[in-house]
A protein has these predicted regions:
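Alpha/beta enzyme core
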Residues: 66-90, 109, 123-136, 149-154, ...
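Alpha-helix-loop-beta-strand connector modules within alpha/beta enzyme cores
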Residues: 36-53, 97-119, 141, 150-168
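Glycine-rich, proline-tolerant flexible connector loops at the mouths of alpha/beta enzymes
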Residues: 24-33, 60-66, 85-106
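Short, cationic motifs built from Arg/Lys/His that form the positively charged side of catalytic pockets
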Residues: 55-57, 107, 116, 125, ...
Length: 174
């Protein structure tokens, strides 16, 4: 299953990142940043009209490379001008060709909330999302047990990040 492959690759990638910058150092940097307790994603999604979270992604396992020339910043700004409520930025590098700089630069250049869309399996990724400027993170029930989901949700909230929780069926919701 593709999800299992992605998670396996993320574990390898995160282990390499931890060799470059330790979890303790990343945590210290993230906790030193201002904690936005306004939770802008929730506020952005309370408009009476339809709310859109528009996605910025270079590639996907099903479609391959979507845009060889990938003007991610232009795309994000156009979404904002078109009335998007928030922007979702793929940061997963192996299957979606995401990069941290996409999230960081978009967050610095738009005024709407920015969601870090990754396959979050380690608290390291949550601290990193905060440092990169995310307003929110994606938590996927299919790859997290209940205890880890709650732990990550609490950590994100402590850092001032909103959580968008993805569930695929009734059992994952329970």
């Amino acid at each position: 299953m593709i999800l299992d492959e992605i998670v396996k690759k993320r574990k390898i990638n995160i282990a390499k990142q931890k060799q470059i910058k330790s979890l303790a150092k990343l945590k210290q940097e993230a906790e030193a940043l201002p904690q936005n307790r306004d939770f802008p994603l929730e506020k952005a999604l309370t408009k009476q009209d339809i709310n859109f979270i528009c996605e910025v992604k270079k590639a996907s396992p099903s479609k391959g490379i979507i845009a060889q020339d990938f003007p991610y910043l232009t795309i994000a700004k156009e979404y904002e001008l078109a009335g998007a409520s928030a922007i979702s930025v793929l940061t997963e590098p192996d299957y979606f060709l995401g990069e941290d700089k996409y999230l960081q630069e978009i967050a610095q250049n738009v005024s709407i909330p920015v969601l870090c869309k990754d396959f979050i399996i380690d608290e390291y990724q949550i601290y990193k999302a905060k440092i990169l400027g995310a307003s929110a993170i994606l938590l996927i029930c299919a790859i997290l047990d209940d205890e880890t989901l709650k732990k990550f949700f609490t950590l994100a909230e402590k850092l001032g990040l909103s959580c968008l929780v993805e569930a695929h069926d009734e059992n994952e919701i329970k």
